[in-house]
């Protein structure tokens, strides 16, 4: 195996560093001075500012000083921790920035175009801008009320045009921004602007995309985290749909909590009457109706089964498993709506789990015999209440049972007529 021979080195020889390996000293103040000097020459004409920024990128190192560039365009100078402007140098700040612009949406949209053109021209600034916004939003407490309004409106515009992702707003979930109501105030202004620009449906979509839909209450000061205050704040700002979103999220969270509590109770072999009492207490606290409770119970008890993979065996296994839980299901099959909801859930489950396709009729028969389901609701499901999932298969499966129910019903009516005639 050949070894690599070392090249001879002359003693005392100095190896010269290539120019491309040399690195200039980091000088954000020098970069700031150059940008401010260029902006001053435009006299605040936004079209001229865009042209200047376009050409300056060929001379100034945007890759290295992108964060400084955005500091200047937003706040007019170098931002230091806390949100104030660095005062180093002869001219540390320019007035040609967002914070010194009028608050009007027309003004904000015009400034938005400066950023759009700049980032479109220098694509590598996209990621830097996203990181910059994470920093700037943390500094909002150090800005004036007017500056916060402008930043909130601009942030809404940047969210709408995709310059920054919605999850950047999560940095506002910070104790020192929350306790004084600054984070909430900022978000309300942002949400209103977003709704005005793009519509409420798009705003809701953005909140879900950013993972904020379940965290909205977290932005409220701790002493104001009540459902009533939440509702009042968003209704006052005509953001009714966010109240609905919050309710839906709270309901989903409550349902997950209920499901876990039910699993724990069953695993602990708690008596069914105690489980029933616990569920009813929980549903009253969380306003979950019986027709939703019964679906949760079904999903939970079916998740606890270890099902045979052979279709011919799974039907009997399912019936034996469900027989144990009929008293629990019966306690919440208290209305026509809850009974129908259960049948539809069983239909959906059997359709989505192919091994259970033949089990549907046996399950419904079990629920009929144990008085979980009434004859009336089974007939209603058959005639008009079924879903389209496996419709023909399940209707055919139920046909003989339904015919038997109908004939039994007719015999009962005939007997009643005879009694009345005597």
UniProtKB/Swiss-Prot annotation:
One of the GO biological process terms: follicle cell of egg chamber development
Record region (Disordered): 1-26
Gene Ontology MF, one: translation initiation factor binding
Recorded GO CC terms: axon; axonal growth cone; cytoplasm; filopodium; neuronal cell body
Record bears the keyword Phosphoprotein: yes
Tissue distribution of the protein: Expressed in mushroom bodies.
Function: May be involved in memory formation.
Protein name (database record): Protein krasavietz
Species this protein is from: Drosophila melanogaster (Fruit fly)
Name of encoding gene: kra
